[in-house]
Structures are given as structure tokens and as C-alpha cells.
């Protein structure tokens, strides 16, 4: 049914976003649903303060770790839902195609870097007041340095995001190219509109 398909796409897009902007704080997850079950469980994307901490980050490796991921307190956080989905061949096949589709056509540097720059331009005039009032960041030059690092990470991310996908799904270059052709077909079917 169409609604279930949309829900599955949203859940995949959630995981794609967590991976693309490597947000290793996957221990803090929240989900919601309606009490009448007209809307089934959906992930809530929030608390992304660990995102973009490294352009090389591999969050998929944590979500698909059947042993569990060690928490700071020594306990293991289990990602049973995602491990179960990963073991489903149909889900994995569509996830790979969707991942390439989203990262190639929407989370690419032609789109993200201008968006990032516009966000920086929006808050830049307020930074001196921010620093004067709160003392954080410690100086304007420190803030500019951090912005430069974030931009560099964002610019380098496409290459590493591809490598993470290939590693976690054991994809050769030839297999990746096959999935990329399917992603291109998906883009053409959607008329270049994100769906």
C-alpha cells in the first residue's frame, strides 16, 4: 500500500541522513506513532550535535552491528530493528538504491555547500553579540575556523559516504554502478523531483 511505502521511504531517509551527516549519537533515538495506529512508528530526527564530527564517519556500521554498540557506561545499545531490516534482501536492495539516489541528487556539494554558506551568512552578523554575551565560541576567529572545518568536512563527505555504503553492503565498483543506474532511473521516473 502507498502509505506503507512512504513510511518505509521515510525510515530509510532517516537512516541515510544519520549516515550522510555522520551522527554517531545514535544512542539517543526517539520514535513516535499515533495511538490509533493510523500512523505507525516513525523515527524522529533530532539531537544531531555530534553530526559532521568527521567526514569519514561510518554510522551504518553501528546501526547494522548485531553484537551491539558499546555505550559510554559500558552497556551495549542494540539496534535490533535496523539489523533485522538489513537482513532483509528486498529492504537492503531498495536502501542501497535510495541511498545513492538521495546522495547523488540531493545531498551533493552543488546543493549542500551553497545551503551551508547561506546558513553561515545568516548567523554571521550575530556572532560578535553571541561571543560578547555568552563567551562561546571563544572568539570570532575560532568560530570562523570551526566553520571552515565543517565546510571542508561537508565537501569531502560524498567520497566517504560512498565508501561507507560499499563497505557495509560489501559492494564492488561494478555492483555500485548497477545500483547507481537504478538510482538514475528512480530520478528520471520522479521527473527530477524528490520523492
Label each region the model flagged.
Residues 10-24:
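Conserved kinase catalytic-core helix
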Residues 1-9:
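Single conserved hydrophobic/aromatic residue that forms the stacking wall/gate
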Residues 18, 29, 41-42:
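Residue-level detector of short, conserved catalytic/binding motifs and their immediate flanks
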Residues 23-35:
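Catalytic-loop signature of eukaryotic-like protein kinases
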Residues 168-195:
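Surface beta-strand/loop "capping" patches
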Residues 1, 14, 48:
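Residues immediately flanking
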Residues 37-173:
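C-terminal catalytic region of ATP-dependent kinase domains
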Amino acid at each position: 500500500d502507498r502509505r506503507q511505502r512512504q513510511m518505509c521511504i521515510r525510515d530509510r531517509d532517516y537512516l541515510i541522513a544519520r549516515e550522510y551527516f555522520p551522527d554517531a549519537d545514535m544512542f539517543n533515538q526517539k520514535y513516535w506513532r499515533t495511538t490509533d495506529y493510523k500512523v505507525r512508528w516513525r523515527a524522529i530526527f533530532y539531537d544531531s550535535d555530534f553530526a559532521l564530527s568527521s567526514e569519514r564517519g561510518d554510522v551504518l556500521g553501528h546501526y547494522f552491528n548485531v553484537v551491539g554498540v558499546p555505550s559510554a557506561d559500558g552497556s551495549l545499545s542494540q539496534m535490533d530493528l535496523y539489523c533485522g531490516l538489513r537482513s532483509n534482501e528486498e529492504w537492503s536492495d531498495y536502501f542501497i538504491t535510495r541511498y545513492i539516489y538521495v546522495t547523488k541528487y540531493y545531498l551533493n556539494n552543488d546543493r549542500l555547500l551553497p545551503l551551508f554558506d547561506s546558513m553561515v551568512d545568516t548567523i554571521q552578523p550575530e556572532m560578535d553579540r553571541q561571543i560578547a554575551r555568552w563567551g562561546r565560541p571563544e572568539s570570532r576567529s575560532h568560530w570562523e575556523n570551526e566553520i571552515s572545518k565543517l565546510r571542508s568536512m561537508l565537501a569531502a563527505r560524498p567520497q566517504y559516504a560512498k565508501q561507507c555504503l560499499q563497505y557495509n553492503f560489501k559492494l564492488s565498483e561494478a555492483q555500485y554502478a548497477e545500483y547507481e543506474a537504478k538510482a538514475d532511473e528512480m530520478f528520471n521516473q520522479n521527473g527530477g523531483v524528490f520523492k
